[in-house]
Design a protein with these regions (language model features):
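Autoinhibitory N-terminal propeptides
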Residues: 1-113, 121, 223
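N-terminal domain-start motif of subtilase-like serine proteases
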Residues: 7-27, 70, 91-142, 172-187, ...
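C-terminal subdomain of the subtilisin-like protease fold in secreted/lumenal serine endopeptidases
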Residues: 22-26, 227, 254, 258-267, ...
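Subtilisin-like serine protease catalytic core
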Residues: 109-239, 256-260, 287-291, 303-305, ...
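Active-site core segment of subtilase-fold serine proteases
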Residues: 129-190, 207-209, 255, 345-430, ...
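Hydrolase catalytic cores
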Residues: 193, 215-223, 249-259, 289, ...
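Short acidic, glycine-rich surface-loop motifs adjacent to enzyme active sites
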Residues: 218-219, 245-273, 295-296, 414-420, ...
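C-terminal tail/sorting-segment detector
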Residues: 665, 684-707
Length: 707
């Protein structure tokens, strides 16, 4: 069993609980847990024997509802090789840094007219959906584009076949529901879904795939735990999230459409193997026309990792003295010593531990205490092999204060041993410096990609920024950190992963992105801080809605998901590997002095249009520019309409088929700002339009000619 499940069994009385465990404590009254199980042989018979129910499976990996009282017995069955689960993650949003206008690509102005996501399902698993926001209708309000929602938190579960919550699959059901169960207090999903797939209604804040179908899953994260009945918390795990991914892919399969999923949530990686079966299950769900995009995380604003190499006697850091259970992890293939010191007003207390001593203890767990100023710090060290390289041993250092009172002590941790190569991973502690020992200043803002973005096959997205301020609805300028255009925002998580792979894969604008905000959240939290970042309020069908500016990799992720929806429209059987190949060949480097891919920028910043040209083979037509034209080009009926800014020289227009054959050529004289051309002679299909001449409009776009 994975560690969280073992802790759950201890709480139920099946095992003795050990002091200082880093696992979060929950109510022990849950009747079952949703978990991954690897079963060899007759899986249905094994699960039935222990009162468990299979919810889904791929190969020999099952997602099952398991009675907590049967976990220990099931884990000892000879046909069961692993049971894995851990609780919910968190929404990846920085609530203190928001602002500004979207790039033209986000507004839909720089996207080719031929590709809008039509015929593609965009899935979003998130929290806080306003199902009534007009951005989820078509631009002209003639069609409602949310097609299904599985609300995992719903308490309307009579006759529901779902392990938690229920789903809503008709327009009447969805609009009557109006918002997800957590929708009065959360709005994150409204914003991310709007970025990926919003029509923009009557605003410039159009999503990247504004004509796609939308399928939603409202799941559980730390943010919306208050909306969950305490006795049901154990039902919400990564296994439940995996069922959510499957739900969206299954919906798309029923409709005969490709699907890309945007997931702007995550949790820390680990060396215990919490995600082994999770990643295998996600890998099995993906394939041709089935792609998952996930946010890298917002962890790089702080120190998260450091390395003590062989040949260096020691390296260390101060840690913020905890008010609750805190943890960090050390990893090495060689023995070393750990020194922790607590500093009081006039005294110190030191704990010096050798890793060999910890490994010699029962269950490789050792507990001790540090004490100053009548305050006690309980320290527990647990050793186990890395799930990636088994000859490397990991040490989880958990520490918990007892009798906390001011003034708080100071705390330091040092890694000692000249012959040991050791890595430090933050866990949930905070690395600091202190004049008490200025040499203890280790720490880098790296190695902090979250899961499941760290999964090899999932496309991991980091965030860049272009503007630093926005005029809010009250006429006040709201300002965030200033970055050069295209630079990674400081909090956007950085690789490598715990097993050494480069992540993120790609960057997209995630700083100061404007998208939809929930009318129900606005109604119930009108004085909330984030409402001061609303850039507009507007009426729609007797409610007041908002457009809001937000920052985080949560916002960058749906930009990439929306882009892949356009690519799926061009190539419905696009695989995750092919999508990454498009990213590899067409992304834009921020700093050309760097080699790519790298752990800050991946392959660079997404280029939606260049990706389409690459997929369609148009990038091989030498006379077609890879730069999108600034002219407004559209097709209405069988007429091509071009709107030009004031130009100083004649403009030529050429049309090419996807095979590279020039099918039309026209000259537009100086002084003509609007021009129309008949397309009656052309067969239906996609064509490249190349506009040349004046530098203001030099570039290309794609059009679609219908019957």
């Amino acid at each position: 069993m994975s560690p969280w499940l073992r802790q759950l069994v201890r709480q139920e009385g099946g095992l003795s609980n050990k002091a200082g465990s880093r696992v979060a404590q929950h109510s022990s009254s849950a009747d079952e847990v949703c978990a991954f199980v690897r079963i060899h042989g007759d899986a249905e018979a094994v699960l039935q024997r222990y009162g468990s129910k299979a919810l889904a499976h791929k190969g020999n990996i099952y997602i099952a509802a398991i009675p907590v009282s049967q976990l220990y017995s099931l884990s000892n069955n000879e046909n069961v090789s692993r049971i894995e689960a851990r609780p919910y993650g968190q929404a990846l949003l920085d609530s203190a840094a928001r602002a500004v206008n979207l790039l033209p690509a986000h507004e839909g102005r720089a996207l080719p007219q031929a590709f809008t996501g039509k015929g593609v399902v965009v899935g979003v698993m998130d929290i806080g959906f306003d199902l009534t926001h007009p951005t989820f209708y078509s631009r002209d309000l003639s069609s409602y584009r949310i097609k299904a929602l599985w609300d995992m938190l719903s308490r309307d579960t009579l006759n529901s076949s779902f392990p938690v919550g229920r789903d809503y699959t008709t327009e009447d059901e969805l609009l009557t529901l109006a918002h997800s169960y957590d929708g009065l207090n959360q709005t994150h999903g409204t914003h991310t879904a709007g970025i990926a797939a919003g029509s923009g209604y009557d605003s410039p804040y159009r999503g990247v795939a504004p004509e796609s179908d939308i399928c939603l899953v409202a799941n559980a994260v730390s943010n919306n735990v208050p909306d969950i009945e305490p006795e049901k918390l154990h039902k919400f795990t990564f296994a439940t999230d995996a069922l959510g991914f499957k739900y969206m892919f299954d919906y798309a399969e029923q409709q005969g459409k490709p699907c890309v999923i945007s997931f702007s949530e995550g949790s820390g990686q680990d060396f215990k193997g919490y995600d082994v079966l999770y990643y295998e299950m996600l890998d099995s769900l993906m394939g041709p026309g089935r792609i998952i995009v996930s946010a890298a995380g917002n962890q790089s604003y702080m120190k998260t990792w450091f390395h003590k190499p062989i040949g260096e006697q020691g390296r260390g850091t101060f840690l913020k003295y905890p008010s609750s259970l805190h943890q960090f992890t050390l990893k090495s293939a060689e023995p070393f010593n750990l020194r922790m010191v607590v500093y009081g007003e006039s005294q110190t207390d030191t704990l010096l531990l050798s890793t060999d001593f910890v490994l010699a203890q029962p269950d490789s767990i050792y507990t001790d205490t540090l004490s100053v100023n009548n305050q006690l710090l309980v320290v527990q060290v647990e050793a186990y092999p890395s799930c990636y390289i088994t000859n490397e041993i990991c040490f989880d250092v958990n520490y918990l204060p007892i009798g906390l009172s001011e003034p708080y002590p100071y705390l330091s941790a040092e890694i000692l041993g000249i012959d040991a190569d050791v890595e430090f991973w933050r866990g949930n502690c905070q690395l600091l410096t202190n004049v008490l020992n200025p040499s203890l200043n280790a720490g880098e803002n790296t190695h902090n990609i979250l899961s499941p973005s760290s999964s090899p096959r999932i496309i991991c997205v980091g965030a860049t920024c272009y503007r630093d301020s926005v005029l809010n609805v009250s006429g006040q300028w709201r300002k965030t950190d200033t970055y050069p255009h295209g630079q990674r925002i400081s909090m956007s998580s950085v690789g490598p992963t715990m097993d050494g792979r480069i992540k993120p894969d790609v960057m997209a604008p995630g700083g100061n992105v404007i998208s939809a905000y929930s009318s129900y959240y606005l109604e119930h939290h009108s004085d909330a801080y984030d409402i001061t970042w609303d850039v507009a309020h507007f009426p729609f069908r007797d409610r007041t809605y908002a457009w809001n500016s937000n920052t985080g990799t949560s916002m960058a992720c749906p930009v990439v998901a929306g882009a892949i929806a356009l690519w799926l429209q061009a190539k419905p059987d696009l695989t995750p590997e092919e999508a990454l190949d498009v990213i590899r060949h067409t992304s834009k480097p921020y700093d050309t002095s760097l080699s790519y891919p790298n752990n800050e920028y991946g392959y660079g910043e997404l280029d939606v249009y260049a990706g389409l040209l690459y997929l369609l083979g148009i990038d091989q037509i030498k006379d077609v520019s890879k730069q999108h034209t600034s002219a407004k080009v559209s097709v209405r009926g069988r007429q091509l309409h071009i709107s030009l800014p004031a130009v100083n020289s004649p403009v030529s227009l050429r049309l090419y088929s996807l095979s590279g054959v020039q099918v039309m050529s026209q000259q537009i004289p100086v002084g003509h700002s609007d021009y129309s051309i008949s397309l009656a002679a052309l067969a239906q299909g996609v064509y490249a339009v190349q506009i040349s001449g004046d530098a203001k409009v030099q570039g290309s776009t794609l059009i679609r000619v219908n019957e």
